[in-house]
Amino acid sequence: MNIVLTDEHKYFVDGKHFDGVTNIIQLEGGSPGLEWVDPWYLERGQMVHIATALYDLGILDESTVDPRIMGYLTSWKRFREDKPPYKPEHIEVKMVDTLYRYAGTIDRLPLLDIKCGVYKKADIAQLGAYFGLCQANKIDRDLYMGPDARQVVYLDEQGGDPIVDAYTVSQVQAARDSFLCALNWHRFKHSK
């Protein structure tokens, strides 16, 4: 299966369009659409995700990191070194649910989502959608059901301790169900 994410943040699986997790949440009012977001915040998010991924892979040259995001990287390092330390097994994983026809890129497995901005109620819906992708792909249960899974990490711009929201399995299952309702509602509205 070939999963492609375009620059316009659209997913194509073997050439067919699949709804993306972030797009569905935006379209259903969980967060502002990309047209309403200052391009700097989109760029910042991309830079932070790349820097943290390279750090986790052990290949980051910190002299190349934009000083504007260094605090976020420091905050990520603090999270990684916390007790017990978080050890990612997979980084920036693209997945697809062929039954519900949606796709997304999971920041880390064990299931974790990295945020640079402020808390939004929709963040748990995003984590729930990723939980659903893990189930659909029948990955190792410890990667989404284990003690290190189901976290949203809000990095601190100044490099301080991040805020970590950890969720129970039942909370994330409920969020997954809510996401699937939003996905189906979106498709129903646009099928006429």
Outline where the language-model segments fall:
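Metal-dependent nuclease catalytic cores that hydrolyze phosphodiester bonds in DNA/RNA
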Residues: 1-103
